[in-house]
Each structure stands twice: as structure tokens, then as C-alpha cells.
């Protein structure tokens, strides 16, 4: 199974990806996580450090693939999850899609691409050009991380459009949304009414999730010294179980931009008309 995790920049994709990878490994699967972001910090919570990128390694070998071995690019992280960082082109030059393609090409040449039960691509922020959705060319499922805010759902809608486009050429499906760092889900529910798709899980605002990222650890590793965090791991295990059940998924039909803007902003304005005493949180302004 190959998964591609997308979402608005800063929404918590890498933290979610690392914990989902561990959850899948906990279920007995051999997992490879590929960071597909020039920041090359996708696997930081699994390894505890910034591992060398494939692009760095290729450049150091003058792009002689035959001189590269699996141990040069694959690092084992917590829980036995293997980790690769694709890296990216220099700022303002090159294409992220090319980097993903080179990463996949190298892993295939090393006979490593097909050794895993699950390969998870953790992909950079928004879909704004043909290069960013490149991991969808290799994925069976796309997973979108969002929150209950306007901007994240607007980005999710663009990603949904990209899934629909890529599904024309191979059997790609959208597994669903994962709500992250949100105490409410009303805006998420409003969106999926207009663009039907599963909501696999909604994680509330949990400070320890943010802290885990800073510490370079997953929640699963933190539970070794603080068993009170076991309940947080259950969110990720639930997501893993749904993915391992090989859901049918959907080929989404995105909402037109202007229609979505009207839908979400009108909903926000209706909520904002209530008084603070009624417990309404202005999630739009918190994004």
C-alpha cells in the first residue's frame, strides 16, 4: 500500500505522518516514510535528527546511481520505521516533482521500493503546480490533513481536485480527511456535505502533540515514559486500522473555488453572529 499525505502548510502533516507510520508498524507492517519536502524534516520525529537527503547523496556521487547503496539513503527510525528524505531543488529553481521522481527511481534501482508493506509519502504544503502532486502518481490512497478552518479546507479542496485528475490515469482514491488540532468539526462537516469524502479521525487540541514534534519524538515513543498519553496514540491507531482495511475511498468532485469561498465564509459569518457566552470559537481567525 502506498499513501500520500497532503494538507495546508503548517497543518501538522509531518507529525501526523510520523505517528501514522508508527501506528502501521505497531500493527505489524513494514513501513517506509518518504519526506517529499525541501525542508527535509518529515522524519525528524522518527529519527531525532535531520537525515541526509537523497538529492544531497546523488549530488555527492555526481548522480552515479550505481555508487549508492540502500544504507546511504535509508535510515531506521523509532519502531523500526525506515526513513528517506527526498530533499528538494534549490530555492527558486527546479521542480519538486522531479525530486520525487528521482527518489522513486533510485529506490526502485536499489530494489527497495517493493520491500515494504506500506510506503507513506509526506508531501509539502499546497498543490499549486504539476510537480507537487507527483507522489499521487505512485499512491493507492491520498490522505488530507486539515483543521476546522477556512484556509486548510480551501487547500484540501485543491488537493481533492488533484486526486480527481490523477485518478484518471491510475486507481488512486482519496481515503479521507484527518482533522488535526481542532476542538470543533462543524466547518469540516459542512465541507464534506458539499464534497463527500470520509473523515477518518478528528484530533483535538493536544499540547503534547506539538511538544512531541519539538522533542523529535512520536507520541508512541513519549508513552514509554508517560503512559497517560496512550489515549493520543489511539487516534493514530484508529487511522491505521481504517487504512489497513483497504477502504473503497472516493474520487472526489471538488467544489468550485467561488462556491467554496461563499459556502465556508457564509458559515463562518453565521457562527460569528452568536455571542461569546454561547461558546463559539472563531476558528477562522485562528488559522
Curated annotation (Swiss-Prot):
Subcellular locations according to the entry: Plastid, Chloroplast
Residue runs in coiled coils: none
GO cellular component: chloroplast
GO MF, one annotated term: metal ion binding
Gene3D superfamilies to which the protein is assigned, alphabetical: P-loop containing nucleotide triphosphate hydrolases
BP terms from Gene Ontology: light-independent chlorophyll biosynthetic process; photosynthesis, dark reaction
PROSITE patterns, per the entry: NIFH_FRXC_1, NIFH_FRXC_2, NIFH_FRXC_3
Binding sites annotated in the UniProt record for Mg(2+): 14
Cofactor annotation: [4Fe-4S] cluster
Cofactor: record remark: Binds 1 [4Fe-4S] cluster per dimer.
UniProt: ATP binding residues: 10-15, 39, 180-181
Binding site for [4Fe-4S] cluster: 95, 129
Function: Component of the dark-operative protochlorophyllide reductase (DPOR) that uses Mg-ATP and reduced ferredoxin to reduce ring D of protochlorophyllide (Pchlide) to form chlorophyllide a (Chlide). This reaction is light-independent. The L component serves as a unique electron donor to the NB-component of the complex, and binds Mg-ATP.
Cross-referenced PANTHER family: LIGHT-INDEPENDENT PROTOCHLOROPHYLLIDE REDUCTASE IRON-SULFUR ATP-BINDING PROTEIN
Record-given protein name: Light-independent protochlorophyllide reductase iron-sulfur ATP-binding protein
Originating species: Nephroselmis olivacea (Green alga)
Lineage: Eukaryota, Viridiplantae, Chlorophyta, Nephroselmidophyceae, Nephroselmidales
